[in-house]
Amino acid sequence: MALLILLFLLPSPLHSQHTCSISKVTSLLEVNCENKKLTALPADLPADTGILHLGENQLGTFSTASLVHFTHLTYLYLDRCELTSLQTNGKLIKLENLDLSHNNLKSLPSLGWALPALTTLDVSFNKLGSLSPGVLDGLSQLQELYLQNNDLKSLPPGLLLPTTKLKKLNLANNKLRELPSGLLDGLEDLDTLYLQRNWLRTIPKGFFGTLLLPFVFLHANSWYCDCEILYFRHWLQENANNVYLWKQGVDVKDTTPNVASVRCANLDNAPVYSYPGKGCPTSSGDTDYDDYDDIPDVPATRTEVKFSTNTKVHTTHWSLLAAAPSTSQDSQMISLPPTHKPTKKQSTFIHTQSPGFTTLPETMESNPTFYSLKLNTVLIPSPTTLEPTSTQATPEPNIQPMLTTSTLTTPEHSTTPVPTTTILTTPEHSTIPVPTTAILTTPKPSTIPVPTTATLTTLEPSTTPVPTTATLTTPEPSTTLVPTTATLTTPEHSTTPVPTTATLTTPEHSTTPVPTTATLTTPEPSTTLTNLVSTISPVLTTTLTTPESTPIETILEQFFTTELTLLPTLESTTTIIPEQNSFLNLPEVALVSSDTSESSPFLNSDFCCFLPLGFYVLGLLWLLFASVVLILLLTWTWHVTPHSLDMEQSAALATSTHTTSLEVQRARQVTMPRAWLLFLQGSLPTFRSSLFLWVRPNGRVGPLVAGRRPSALSQGRGQDLLGTVGIRYSGHSL
């Protein structure tokens, strides 16, 4: 009997219960088999399982082939299952989350083929010593990778190249000593990087690239601060608000930045970002970023002109205009140097003294000032008589001129030097330091056959002035400064010295000015004025003043480069023209602007000054006109308004003859004489009032108390005059 009772109490095999709990989470079926002491996958799992928990069991090994028939499986948790190996011989096409944490895995197989849709992979707290280079191949959808708390000592190059959508990378608590330089290449979506608690000593140059990492954890490493850490130091300085100190159980978004947590292990835990880097090279190879603050100063360069006394031809090219045609065979260069500030230099000259000439000091100061201006100016002062027996001042061979604008050809037996002139100084009978770097040379008669592209004009001695295209002032004899780029030719037996660009030689007793635009004058052996003007006027501005006993300073703005050879160079471009026994005084120089500026009155400075004044006067006139109009309008309105008011009052009186307003006092009787209403030609006006009957609380109506009576007109005939009758209670109204 007892045995029958025991058999009845035993559970029937037909009614076996499930070992795992099943629940529905959203649209996925969740099966929880945690801590069931399982050694293999349960056989009674639902086929539509979407979330499977197998943690805290003793599985040992696991193969993805056992889950192939679970086509809806999306989340798989295998944490704390004492796994030592993982086999990926089955394809789980929908699996997105795989948790393999807290196991004994020492290696990982390739996961790309078996898990193509994987987005989160957690292999933390295992015993991984290394990773194969292709372990993540095929995981193009991976967004989170957790590898913390392993034994990783190094990472293969290109490990993360397949995972271009990676957002979180956790490599904390490993034994990493170094990182591959291109580890983060292509990870544009990466926002959180955990590298704390490793054995890192430095970060390779360019490791972070152009990534904007909002959350980075770098503390508790063996950072060694030397010259190799300068890149990492600069990155910390630039991203100080993105470096955090990790705290267990605290979300990264709840922590505060702490860049000082990254410390140097060899400098008493000093912050890496404050490492001074003394003695380290500062070459561009030390940094992998663009430093826009350290802009090196560009050294200013100056254009130098060299020319020689041999028979070769040299050509000068203006930087802003085309050079004149010439037969030059030398190389040509065009240079635009920057504008220089005024400089003061000294040049030493060796001079010889001739009888009757004023002695110049050996040391002369030159203050050339260069500015960026464009001018079309021709300087034409009066001619100056120059004897052919002048004394040459020979400069020493280490001074370079800054300007030259001529092309000069000298045959072998010629003694004509090539001076360049831009500044003219004519002090009177005294020894004055003159700003100069050029020399006036009185050549001997020579024959210089040189082809030229300018117009050749032969002028006989005369006193007839030739028309010019600029304002010409002919004061007392002086020296002419004419820039030119034409080729100079002096005929045979000429007694006229050959000037270049700015020196004009005029024989005695010649008063004939020479045209100053595109004209080359070649005199015969006579006392005729010789002048050279380029066929192409260079853009030049020259300001020339001649105070007594004061050097004349000329401000020039023209940049060009000329290649010449074998002649001592000059620093400035000034010509000193002596006269026998005295210096000629230059009282006046005509400064002629271009024809365009003369013909246009709007370019005149006086006109520009009067233009605002004119607009101001017009504005005042307009204001005055508007005020007068306003005054007239107000005056007209003042006269018109009274008439309008009279008309309105008349209309009101006409209307009032047919309207009467009566005020009746509230009393028992109102006496109204009929004579008051005789002027009304019609029926009597009707009155309408309201009568309120007050009802006492006891229900009685009336009699009416004092102060609550109907109007006087309603007594006796009130039934015809009353409009509406309202009934009110003592307490409230209906």
Swiss-Prot record:
InterPro entries according to UniProt: Cys-rich_flank_reg_C (IPR000483), Leu-rich_rpt (IPR001611), Leu-rich_rpt_typical-subtyp (IPR003591), LRR_dom_sf (IPR032675)
Residues bearing PTM Phosphoserine: 711, 714
Glycosylation: residue positions: 301, 311, 315-316, 335, 339, 348, 358, 377, 382, 384-385, 405, 512, 516, 519, 530, 542, 546, 550, 562, 572-573
Domain LRRNT: 17-47
PROSITE patterns xref list: LRR
Disulfide bonds: 20-33, 225-264, 227-280
PTM comment, free text: O-glycosylated.
Record-annotated LRRCT domain positions: 221-282
Start and end residues of each stretch annotated as Disordered: 406-429, 460-526
Domain of life: Eukaryota
Subcellular location, record wording: Membrane
Signal peptide coordinates: 1-16
Topology in the lipid bilayer: Single-pass type I membrane protein
Residue ranges, Cytoplasmic side: 634-734
Extracellular side: 17-612
Keyword terms: Blood coagulation, Cell adhesion, Disulfide bond, Glycoprotein, Hemostasis, Leucine-rich repeat, Membrane, Phosphoprotein, Repeat, Signal, Sulfation, Transmembrane, Transmembrane helix
Pfam families for the chain: LRR_8 (PF13855)
Functional description taken from the UniProt entry: GP-Ib, a surface membrane protein of platelets, participates in the formation of platelet plugs by binding to the A1 domain of vWF, which is already bound to the subendothelium.
Note: Platelet activation apparently involves disruption of the macromolecular complex of GP-Ib with the platelet glycoprotein IX (GP-IX) and dissociation of GP-Ib from the actin-binding protein.
Name of the protein in its database record: Platelet glycoprotein Ib alpha chain
Species name: Mus musculus (Mouse)
